[in-house]
Amino acid sequence: MERTFAIIKPDAVERNIVGKVLEKIEAAGFRIVGMKKIQLSKKEAEGFYYVHSERPFFGDLCSFMSRSPVVVLALERENAIAKWREVMGATNPANADAGTIRKEFGLSIEENTVHGSDSPESAAFEIPYFFSQLELL
């Protein structure tokens, strides 16, 4: 079994669609092994998204991710990373396939409802950034 990391972003939490996103996650065969609702500080968002620190959108991304609560998740299933990327859809909701979370719920390239690890290395950094081993089932 493989694990991946997901965030239900502020835009989705603000619109009260967390339950709908969780339904899609479970329907895709994921087991939720860790979940909590948190309020990121700007500094925590900057630490999490450090790989984008030189990109022009970094400041806006960190402000967005710290503007209101998010739900962080550790997910498990076979081929979890690739499957979660498939279920999320393209980063830009306008380019996402029908039936994906971002196509159904995303508002823009920034307010695109969810984040997901893009590699085993990312998941290995992202899961312990938010969860201790004791919090994972």
UniProtKB/Swiss-Prot annotation:
Molecular function terms, GO-annotated: ATP binding; metal ion binding; nucleoside diphosphate kinase activity
Q: Pfam family example for this protein? A: NDK
GO annotation, cellular component aspect:
cytoplasm
Write the Enzyme Commission number(s) for this entry. Answer: 2.7.4.6
Kindly give the InterPro entries that the UniProt entry links to this protein.
NDK-like_dom (IPR034907), NDK-like_dom_sf (IPR036850), Nucleoside_diP_kinase (IPR001564), Nucleoside_diP_kinase_AS (IPR023005)
One GO biological process term: GTP biosynthetic process
Binding sites annotated in the UniProt record for ATP: K9, F57, R85, T91, R102, N112
Quick check: keyword Magnesium in the entry? yes
Biological role stated in the UniProt entry: Major role in the synthesis of nucleoside triphosphates other than ATP. The ATP gamma phosphate is transferred to the NDP beta phosphate via a ping-pong mechanism, using a phosphorylated active-site intermediate.
Q: Which PANTHER family match?
A: NUCLEOSIDE DIPHOSPHATE KINASE, NUCLEOSIDE DIPHOSPHATE KINASE DDB_G0292928-RELATED
Q: How does it assemble?
A: Homotetramer.
Q: What is this protein called?
A: Nucleoside diphosphate kinase
